[in-house]
Amino acid sequence: MISQERLLKVILAPHISEKSTVCAENDNTVVFRVAIDATKAEVKAAVAQLFEVEVDSVRTLVNKGKTKRTGARMGRRVDWKKAYVTLADGAEIDFVGAE
């Protein structure tokens, strides 16, 4: 059993991009930025509990941070994790909340 506190820390934000919009329209898939140490089971449980929807599958990937120049020094951006969450037929998540 995953604690309530942990579930609230797993999902950081929805990831909005051209690809995520196409996935949402065609495949009933929503894309989230998640904690780097989050597992697929935690992501599935968090989405199911927070948005009250049924989740079919979860696919995750880690985006490696890019090396960037800041003045004379070289810096590195932070690695971050993204999760593609496929919802069951008939389920949808409304981020806008408009009726």
Swiss-Prot record:
<dbReference type="GO" id="GO:0003735">
    <property type="term" value="F:structural constituent of ribosome"/>
</dbReference>
<dbReference type="InterPro" id="IPR013025">
    <property type="entry name" value="Ribosomal_uL23-like"/>
</dbReference>
<keyword id="KW-0689">Ribosomal protein</keyword>
<dbReference type="GO" id="GO:1990904">
    <property type="term" value="C:ribonucleoprotein complex"/>
</dbReference>
<dbReference type="GO" id="GO:0019843">
    <property type="term" value="F:rRNA binding"/>
</dbReference>
<keyword id="KW-0687">Ribonucleoprotein</keyword>
<dbReference type="InterPro" id="IPR001014">
    <property type="entry name" value="Ribosomal_uL23_CS"/>
</dbReference>
<dbReference type="InterPro" id="IPR012677">
    <property type="entry name" value="Nucleotide-bd_a/b_plait_sf"/>
</dbReference>
<keyword id="KW-0699">rRNA-binding</keyword>
<comment type="similarity">
    <text>Belongs to the universal ribosomal protein uL23 family.</text>
</comment>
<keyword id="KW-0694">RNA-binding</keyword>
<comment type="subunit">
    <text>Part of the 50S ribosomal subunit. Contacts protein L29, and trigger factor when it is bound to the ribosome.</text>
</comment>
<dbReference type="GO" id="GO:0006412">
    <property type="term" value="P:translation"/>
</dbReference>
<dbReference type="GO" id="GO:0005840">
    <property type="term" value="C:ribosome"/>
</dbReference>
<comment type="function">
    <text>One of the early assembly proteins it binds 23S rRNA. One of the proteins that surrounds the polypeptide exit tunnel on the outside of the ribosome. Forms the main docking site for trigger factor binding to the ribosome.</text>
</comment>
<dbReference type="InterPro" id="IPR012678">
    <property type="entry name" value="Ribosomal_uL23/eL15/eS24_sf"/>
</dbReference>
<dbReference type="Pfam" id="PF00276">
    <property type="entry name" value="Ribosomal_L23"/>
</dbReference>
<protein>
    <recommendedName>
        <fullName>Large ribosomal subunit protein uL23</fullName>
    </recommendedName>
</protein>
